[in-house]
Amino acid sequence: MRDRVSPMRLGVDFGTTTTAIAIVDRGNYPIVSFVNNREDTVDFIPSILALDGDHLVYGFDAEDAAREGAPHLRSFKRLLSDPSVTDTSTLRLGNHSISVLDALTGFLTYVARTVRTNSSVASVPASEKLEALVGIPAHAWSAQRFLTLE
């Protein structure tokens, strides 16, 4: 069993269509599984965001909202490969303008919350620190790499 004194260490593969997470566990790196909103166990979180009314939702919630016709953006990671993207860049979703940095931060916050509450390692208390290594998009320019790190 993992030592609870040290923070949980995760590797996050922020993929174009799905995001996969692995946990560091005594030299092993098992993939974290999740239960989606249809009660299926999957080894990923969908890399999607959507507007549910005026609220931005991510992952499984965004997938459901998109099925219901909500404005959504799949593969939003691709925005980071545009050389003109900076920390002040925005994206359009429906009639809303959203900061790319806010979208990325919101998605990764959703990932952390889902790891804590709805995953194969969901016993992680909210007070326990998570340390994550997030993969930087391969075809991103320097500014976009820094945006991901931010």
PLM regions and their residue ranges:
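Phosphate-binding loop and its immediate beta->loop->alpha context
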Residues: 27-150
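Gly/Thr-rich phosphate-binding beta-strand-loop-beta motif of the actin/hexokinase/Hsp70
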Residues: 2-31
